[in-house]
């Protein structure tokens, strides 16, 4: 099946697929079963039953679109306006359907010699009148899902086809077409000169050279504000001498998901061209064993000068991230730092495969990130970044820090505190996507859209939207507005409400006093 590339304003020869809800005037013989399609081929039309209209929102539209693209048995042209509900405006329909269909229709890396027959049916969009706002939403959705698929494709590629050197070269070549991006690849000698010994310690067991890829976008050169994204890029994680059991080693090609995500974000940023400064750092190596691989109990000096005792070579992710965070804070002059990594197994235990675990150094930066996730329709959950979790990071008798402790049962929390040690007090977000980066052997490109929105600092504003502001789930359906304005508006509303309550209390008090005097 081909990807969606345009919205058509006239009918084509495909069957027109319309949404129908509970209580709507239904044609005869309509099958009223959730997501069931009933076809009336003489009229060249079909209806999909979607239950209660009041309950059909963005998530339902997205999941329907994904399922339709995966199981499409006929070519359909979707009548987009029929899917609009009080929870979902036309922009939300366009956004959800574009992302859902192109997610499922994407042809990722595959070396199978015998594959099932390619679905030759097609899906297309029909919207008689397209406003510029709707067209902008459509174009943005295409860019975001393309970036998401880019990250997914890198993730699914096997480790013998995508080592550290190959991944860096792919980024270098692929990003040449974006003239507003500056790509710099650091090789071993440059990494050594910078004193990134934590990355080099992980790379000691590899037959491939480490790479640090720096991607910079300057959308506002006059501003000192800069968001720096850091992605873990372990192209395969055997655990090193702290060797993983075989069943836990499968799927470790996805341990580079963090780097794939931040690269995909920069791909989208280059096309969306926000008036912001955003950079990304990919720290790339594999973690394997040879005669010179890092041994448990070894001590290394980080770029920051802090020494680290490596108690567990399978806790390598925090080592490669630490040097990159410090680089982002001190060399790239970040004013906001954010990293993403498939970091800890305890995060999978804590939140499963539903929510990505998020750590934030302040409520302000957390709310900025949470707003971005809401716009992107991705599930995030704030985790505790508390000094109590840092105690076991400082148990070493021979170094400033240790990278792992058997005395701490919530390793996702201690790992976050370990990384915070290298942020140079820059406002910081840490995203542990160990449970959400991939599912059933397939990469999801998780948080790509959230990171893009976070980098753009986009906020919701439904003032001129045709949907019900209180019920609309589209989130990004209108004009961008700064966090400051929204916070001020909320505070102003709260202040007015408080004043109103106070006035009411005073009035009530006077009334009570008058009644009291009357009794007397």
Swiss-Prot record:
Region (Disordered): 488-520
Family per similarity comment: Belongs to the peptidase M17 family.
Catalytic activity, as annotated: Release of an N-terminal amino acid, Xaa-|-Yaa-, in which Xaa is preferably Leu, but may be other amino acids including Pro although not Arg or Lys, and Yaa may be Pro. Amino acid amides and methyl esters are also readily hydrolyzed, but rates on arylamides are exceedingly low; Release of an N-terminal amino acid, preferentially leucine, but not glutamic or aspartic acids
PROSITE patterns in alphabetical order: CYTOSOL_AP (PS00631)
Protein name, entry field: Probable cytosol aminopeptidase
Keyword Metal-binding carried by entry: yes
HAMAP family, sorted: Cytosol_peptidase_M17
Cofactor(s) in the UniProt record: Mn(2+)
EC number: 3.4.11.1, 3.4.11.10
Note describing how the cofactor binds: Binds 2 manganese ions per subunit.
Function: Presumably involved in the processing and regular turnover of intracellular proteins. Catalyzes the removal of unsubstituted N-terminal amino acids from various peptides.
SUPFAM superfamilies (UniProt xref): Macro domain-like, Zn-dependent exopeptidases
Binding site for Mn(2+) 2: 232, 237, 255, 316
Organism whose genome encodes this protein: Metamycoplasma salivarium
Binding site for Mn(2+) 1: 237, 314, 316
Active site residues according to the UniProt entry: 244, 318
MF term (GO), any: manganese ion binding
Transmembrane intervals: none
A Gene Ontology biological process term: proteolysis
GO cellular component: cytoplasm
Protein location: Cytoplasm
Main location: cytoplasm
Keywords: Aminopeptidase, Cytoplasm, Hydrolase, Manganese, Metal-binding, Protease
């Amino acid at each position: 099946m081909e990807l969606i590339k345009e919205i058509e304003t006239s009918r084509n020869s495909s069957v027109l697929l319309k949404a129908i809800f509970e209580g709507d005037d239904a044609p005869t013989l309509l099958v009223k079963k959730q997501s069931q399609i009933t076809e009336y081929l003489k009229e060249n039309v079909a209806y999909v039953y979607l239950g209660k209209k009041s309950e059909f929102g963005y998530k339902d539209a997205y999941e329907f679109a994904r399922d339709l693209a995966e199981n499409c048995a006929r070519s359909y042209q979707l009548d987009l306006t029929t899917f609009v509900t009080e929870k979902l405006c036309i922009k939300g329909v366009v956004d959800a359907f574009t992302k859902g269909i192109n997610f499922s229709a994407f042809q990722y890396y595959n070396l199978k010699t015998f594959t099932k027959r390619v679905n030759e049916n097609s899906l297309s969009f029909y919207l008689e009148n397209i406003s510029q706002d709707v067209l902008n939403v459509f174009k943005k959705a295409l860019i975001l899902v393309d970036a998401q698929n880019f990250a997914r494709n890198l993730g699914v590629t096997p480790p013998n086809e995508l080592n550290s050197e190959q991944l860096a070269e792919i980024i270098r070549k692929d990003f040449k077409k974006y003239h507003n991006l500056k790509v710099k690849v650091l090789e071993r000698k440059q990494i050594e000169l910078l004193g990134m010994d934590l990355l080099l310690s992980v790379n000691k067991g590899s037959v491939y050279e480490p790479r640090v890829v720096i991607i910079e976008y300057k959308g506002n050169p006059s501003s000192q504000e800069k968001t720096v994204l850091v992605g873990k890029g372990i192209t395969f994680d055997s655990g090193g001498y702290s060797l993983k059991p075989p069943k836990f080693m499968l799927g470790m090609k996805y341990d580079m998901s963090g780097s794939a995500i931040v690269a995909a974000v920069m791909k989208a940023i280059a096309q969306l061209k926000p008036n912001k400064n955003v950079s990304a750092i990919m720290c790339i190596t594999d973690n394997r064993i040879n005669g010179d691989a890092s041994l448990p109990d070894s001590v290394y000096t980080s770029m920051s000068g802090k020494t680290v005792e490596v108690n567990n070579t399978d806790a390598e992710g925090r080592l490669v991230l630490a040097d990159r965070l410090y680089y982002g804070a001190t060399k790239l002059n970040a004013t906001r730092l954010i990293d993403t990594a498939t970091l800890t197994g305890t995060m999978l235990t804590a939140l499963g495969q539903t929510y990505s675990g998020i750590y934030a150094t302040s409520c302000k930066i957390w709310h900025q990130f949470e707003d971005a996730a809401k716009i992107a329709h991705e599930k995030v959950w704030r985790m505790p970044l508390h000094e109590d979790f840092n105690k076991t990071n400082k148990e070493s008798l021979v170094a400033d820090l240790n990278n792992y402790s058997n005395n701490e049962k919530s390793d996702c929390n201690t790992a976050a505190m370990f990384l915070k040690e290298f942020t140079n007090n820059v406002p910081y977000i840490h995203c542990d996507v160990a449970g959400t980066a991939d599912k059933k052997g397939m990469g999801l490109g998780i948080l790509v859209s959230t990171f893009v929105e976070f980098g753009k600092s986009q906020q919701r504003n439904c003032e001129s939207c045709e949907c019900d502001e209180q019920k609309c789930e589209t989130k990004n359906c209108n004009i961008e507005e700064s966090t400051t304005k929204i916070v001020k508006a909320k505070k102003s509303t709260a202040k007015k409400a408080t004043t109103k309550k106070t006035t009411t209390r005073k009035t009530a008090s006077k009334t009570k006093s008058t009644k009291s005097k009357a009794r007397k």
